[in-house]
Swiss-Prot record:
It holds the Pfam family Enolase_N. It catalyses: (2R)-2-phosphoglycerate = phosphoenolpyruvate + H2O. Belongs to the enolase family. It comes from Methylocella silvestris (strain DSM 15510 / CIP 108128 / LMG 27833 / NCIMB 13906 / BL2). GO terms for molecular function: magnesium ion binding; phosphopyruvate hydratase activity. This is Enolase. Catalyzes the reversible conversion of 2-phosphoglycerate (2-PG) into phosphoenolpyruvate (PEP). It is essential for the degradation of carbohydrates via glycolysis. Its main location: cytoplasm. The active site is at residues 205, 337.
Amino acid sequence: MTAIIDIAAREILDSRGNPTVEVDVTLEDGSHGRAAVPSGASTGAHEAVELRDGDKSRYGGKGVLKAIENVNRDIFEALSGLEAEDQGRIDEIMISLDGTPNKSKLGANAILGVSLAVAKAAADASALPLYRYVGGVQAHVLPVPMMNIINGGVHADNPIDFQEFMILPVGAPSIAEAVRWGSEVFQLLKSSLKKAGHNTNVGDEGGFAPNLPSAEAALDFCVQAIEAAGFKPGVDIFLGLDCAATEFFKDGAYVYSGEGVTRSPEEQANYLAKLSASYPIASIEDGMSEDDWAGWKAVTELIGSKIQLVGDDLFVTNVTRLEEGIKKGIANSILVKVNQIGSLTETLAAVDMAQRAGYTAVMSHRSGETEDSTIADLAVATNCGQIKTGSLARSDRTAKYNQLIRIEEELGSQARYAGLKALKALA
């Protein structure tokens, strides 16, 4: 009944107006699944490869017709007739068909689109929501949202070197209330930025992108907005950073071009420690560059027992790199992006490895998103307790928050909001 009878891919647009892959999977019983693949701006060197056409006459070379052809021809031929419920086998077949260590032949965007659409079709056939199909009866934890309210780095055209300044409403009683808290802080931040003479244009992920001189200035505005909304910084709402340090790591040093400052790895670790001591920061992502393992070790030893240190470019949702980090005692959390590794099975394996090692896991979007809300379901399915999906603006971001609100409503009395316990270093 769940045999795959059709797989069809198409080229659609993401939130930046760039093409991406969308896949439909149809089963023998008429069940259907659809998934759209996100795309990153600051990408780790060790990520699975997003296959682009390179034809400058279409979308400036960013077209995905090759990936679509791979889905409609090679992948469909390999999967036709297989049972959609056998997710592990299906993903394994696609990975073997690709045959490269980074999915560069078929494209991670091709493989992932099919992988997620297959899971959705199987869930449809089972008459279950995706979070329940993937996570089973234990899937009931609603994640703390890491809401990106100020953008910098490659996500914005401003002098701020850090990529994201986030709020984490850990004290809220529910995801619906957490979204309300975040929205109220977001709107008050907009007002305070305007009063201070800053523009309130938004970046790729919906956060404001003001011309602020430093990370400290951005953090000050965040704290003021939290207080103006009637919440207590460091109690009701914490702060989070995504430094995206790989983007400004040059010749062994961290070059803050916006501030005109250069820091050695040791100075970078000390700077992050200083920030975390001065502000109610609960989480720092990619505070060191992806291959600066010594720097990561230093910052972990310095503040890893106090706050969450998230590896994004460091781990790229890859169990091999995560295993190495665990063995070396580096970071204490992994950012989970389905398109970094390129299949649902491998994504779930990364979350499982992290949780078994006592690391936290944060389900995450990409800066180039679509209206697809799969990651909201996956956050609940894995009970990971945290989700990073942008600001309180742009429908490509709010689609995920809205889906979480629906899931919470559907779970009813079974629903549990993760709260402060999601951040083990602080709980």
